[in-house]
């Protein structure tokens, strides 16, 4: 596979941007779904408090509580929510802590400024400050927002997310030159 469109959710979206910023010649485009770019200070503070909790012996309970309370809407499907919470709680502590810490420590501004490939950000909620900052640094950024789903919008309203990605691929990606 050459020049893939890299699609990532949450940390995966941050990784997609990092790939485009560092190795844009290898990436055709990126799609970041619910990636926490340019988080506002209250969110940063909440995550730092959560990081302190998951560094301790009760990390699985802290993780379950945070995911249950912060990443879902009241209307999100209960069974799916429980499956996600339990699967995420299986993540080993030595993986969970640095993964979350790195989402917020990576230089989003440098990554956005260096991104030269088509980029789509699909958010579940309104993040005007984050989107404005991203667009300031990456003017070609396209943004979509799902309706009626929380952080796991790709699982809760996949038709909305997939439709946005499909349209992005049709309109923003030029066909590859014949090999």
Tell me what each language-model feature is.
Residues 10-13, 23:
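Active-site loop->helix "elbow" adjoining a glycine-rich segment at hydrolase catalytic centers
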Residues 17-22, 26-58:
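Flexible "cap/lid" loop of the alpha/beta hydrolase fold
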Residues 40-45, 57-113:
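Conserved alpha/beta-hydrolase catalytic His-Asp/Glu region
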Residues 141-179:
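Catalytic active-site module of serine/aspartate enzymes centered on a nucleophile-bearing elbow/loop
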């Amino acid at each position: 596979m050459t020049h893939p469109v890299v699609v990532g959710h949450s940390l995966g979206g941050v990784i997609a941007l990092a790939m485009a910023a560092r190795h844009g010649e290898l990436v055709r485009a990126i799609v970041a779904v619910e990636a926490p770019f340019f988080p506002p200070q209250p969110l940063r503070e909440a995550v730092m408090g959560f990081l302190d909790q998951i560094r301790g012996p009760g990390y699985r309970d802290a993780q379950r509580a945070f995911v249950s309370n912060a990443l879902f809407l009241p209307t999100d499907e209960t069974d799916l929510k429980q499956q996600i919470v339990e699967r995420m709680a299986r993540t080993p502590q030595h993986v969970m802590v640095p993964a979350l810490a790195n989402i917020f420590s990576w230089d989003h501004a440098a990554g956005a400024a260096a991104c030269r490939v088509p980029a789509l950000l699909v958010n579940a909620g309104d993040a005007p400050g984050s989107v404005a900052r991203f667009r300031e640094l990456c003017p070609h950024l396209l943004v979509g927002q799902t309706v009626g789903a929380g952080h796991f919008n790709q699982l809760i309203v996949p038709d909305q997310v997939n439709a946005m990605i499909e349209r992005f691929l049709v309109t923003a990606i030029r066909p590859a030159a014949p090999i």
